[in-house]
Amino acid sequence: MNKKSIRNVNLKGKRVFDRV
């Protein structure tokens, strides 16, 4: 939801932020 969430996902290398 927040920009922090997208950064956390980037660390794992997932594409969850793609849904945002």
From Swiss-Prot:
Its main location: cytoplasm. One of its GO terms (cellular component) is cytoplasm. Residues 1-20 are annotated as: Disordered. Its EC number is 2.7.2.3. The keyword Isomerase does not apply. Pathway: Carbohydrate degradation; glycolysis; pyruvate from D-glyceraldehyde 3-phosphate: step 2/5. Keywords: ATP-binding, Cytoplasm, Glycolysis, Kinase, Nucleotide-binding, Stress response, Transferase. GO terms for biological process: glycolytic process. Disulfide bonds: none annotated. It is found in: Cytoplasm. It comes from the Bacteria. One of its GO terms (molecular function) is ATP binding. Coiled coil: none annotated. Induction: By heat shock. It catalyses: (2R)-3-phosphoglycerate + ATP = (2R)-3-phospho-glyceroyl phosphate + ADP. Belongs to the phosphoglycerate kinase family. Monomer. This is Phosphoglycerate kinase.
